[in-house]
């Protein structure tokens, strides 16, 4: 099968893809245990490099799965949630899942006031899909958006299964593979 990356990658990587306005990565590297001929790895790491997007600078997004935890996570000081997305910035970090968000280190953000909600609460993705089929608007994660996200996830999986150190370089819709 396609493993955790294909199952949950579209949910967890949605957070950075949406917040950072990401599309096609410029390069991808993947690391993990020796590849299995039939299934995706249970433990892996995929590193995506994205170029500048308008006023947004280049950014690196790293997917960690299974025992492949980030070093900063292992050092402590970060809540040990089962799942989540950790945004690391110059002034601190944001740990998020779909139910909660924590600014870190917490002591540095003790007086922080959350900004007002910018977007209305969306209907369920099932309802958005039904409404779109009826011509009542577009879903938040339509194919124009989710195609880039899903393709990036699958490429991370593919690269994790083809060799020890993998780099794929994307150019628009063209993909080049280098060893």
Which role does the model predict for each range below?
Residues 1-144, 148-179:
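Contiguous beta-strand/loop segments that form the cofactor/metal-binding neighborhood of enzyme cores
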């Amino acid at each position: 099968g396609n493993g955790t990356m294909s199952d949950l990658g579209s949910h967890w990587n949605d957070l950075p893809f949406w917040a950072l306005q990401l599309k096609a990565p410029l390069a991808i590297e993947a690391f993990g245990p020796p590849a299995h001929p039939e299934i995706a790895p249970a433990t892996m790491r995929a590193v995506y490099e994205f170029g500048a997007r308008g006023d947004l600078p280049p950014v690196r997004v790293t997917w960690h799965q299974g025992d492949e935890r980030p070093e900063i996570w292992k050092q402590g000081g970060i809540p040990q949630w089962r799942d989540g997305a950790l945004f690391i910035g110059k002034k601190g970090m944001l740990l998020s899942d779909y139910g909660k968000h924590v600014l870190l280190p917490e002591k540095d953000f003790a007086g922080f006031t959350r900004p007002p909600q910018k977007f209305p609460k969306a209907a369920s993705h099932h309802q958005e899909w039904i409404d779109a089929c009826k011509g009542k608007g577009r879903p938040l994660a339509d194919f124009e958006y989710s195609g880039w996200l899903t393709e990036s996830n699958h490429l991370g999986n593919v690269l994790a299964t083809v060799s020890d150190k993998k780099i794929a370089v994307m150019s628009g819709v063209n993909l080049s593979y280098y060893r």
